[in-house]
């Protein structure tokens, strides 16, 4: 299954690869092989990148699931942006080989969707969470607020987010993607018990990040 978030990119890539194959008809044989081979590999990688497998969200209450596929690269204490109360930041690195469709981490009401322009530092550079282009999102489940950010990277410069303020969403629902790698940062209130460790591989909509 392919994600609809990548339709335009898939169409453009397909047309480009077809053009390369046409050009290959008018060049020497060895060059033909290389160009057609490159076109096929490029198209297959694009289709692979925009895959969107089904996910089964745990049938449990009082959980927060991962909004992204990838590896937990940092768990660190922080403070909630508005109140200054203690919180925990969980940072997930998404490589180009991970599934890039993002999913809602907790059921609730969207209280904020804010685009922040910025730089395009490498995603594994922790300065990127504050200085890179990103989409900041807040969800209120009636007990507390969870914040998370889709962060652009050096390669990933296209954020897709379909959430709007006042949307009521359910845990595990698709809401967007970051094209071609990057990171997602979550800020969990201190009342949430973190259930992952640095270095853990996580899957969007399935891996339990925290319990409350």
Curated annotation (Swiss-Prot):
Location, primary (coarse class): membrane
GO molecular-function terms, A-Z: phosphatidylserine decarboxylase activity
Cofactor: pyruvate
UniProtKB keywords: Cell membrane, Decarboxylase, Lipid biosynthesis, Lipid metabolism, Lyase, Membrane, Phospholipid biosynthesis, Phospholipid metabolism, Pyruvate, Zymogen
Modification comment: Is synthesized initially as an inactive proenzyme. Formation of the active enzyme involves a self-maturation process in which the active site pyruvoyl group is generated from an internal serine residue via an autocatalytic post-translational modification. Two non-identical subunits are generated from the proenzyme in this reaction, and the pyruvate is formed at the N-terminus of the alpha chain, which is derived from the carboxyl end of the proenzyme.
Entry annotation: catalytic residues: 182 (schiff-base intermediate with substrate)
Enzyme Commission designation: 4.1.1.65
PANTHER family, A to Z: ARCHAETIDYLSERINE DECARBOXYLASE PROENZYME-RELATED (PTHR35809:SF1)
Family recorded in the similarity comment: Belongs to the phosphatidylserine decarboxylase family. PSD-A subfamily.
Protein name from the UniProt record: Phosphatidylserine decarboxylase proenzyme
């Amino acid at each position: 299954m392919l994600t609809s978030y990548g339709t335009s990119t898939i169409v453009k890539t397909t047309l480009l690869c077809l053009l390369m194959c046409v050009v290959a008809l008018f060049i020497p044989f060895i060059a033909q092989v290389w160009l057609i081979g490159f076109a096929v590999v490029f198209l297959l990688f694009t289709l692979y990148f925009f895959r969107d497998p089904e996910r089964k969200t745990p049938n449990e209450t009082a959980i927060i699931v991962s909004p992204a596929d990838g590896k937990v690269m940092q768990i660190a204490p922080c403070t909630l942006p508005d109140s200054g109360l203690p919180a925990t930041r969980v940072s997930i690195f998404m490589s180009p080989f991970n599934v890039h469709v993002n999913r809602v981490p907790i059921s609730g009401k969207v209280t904020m969707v804010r685009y922040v322009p910025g730089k395009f530092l490498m995603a594994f550079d922790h300065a990127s969470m504050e200085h890179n282009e990103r989409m900041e999102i807040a969800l209120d489940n009636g007990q507390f607020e969870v914040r998370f950010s889709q962060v652009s990277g050096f390669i990933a410069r296209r954020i897709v987010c379909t959430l709007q303020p006042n949307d009521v969403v359910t845990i595990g629902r698709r809401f967007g993607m970051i094209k071609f790698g990057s990171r997602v940062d979550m800020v969990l209130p201190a009342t949430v018990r973190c259930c992952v460790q640095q270095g853990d591989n996580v899957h969007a909509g399935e891996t339990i990040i925290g319990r409350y």
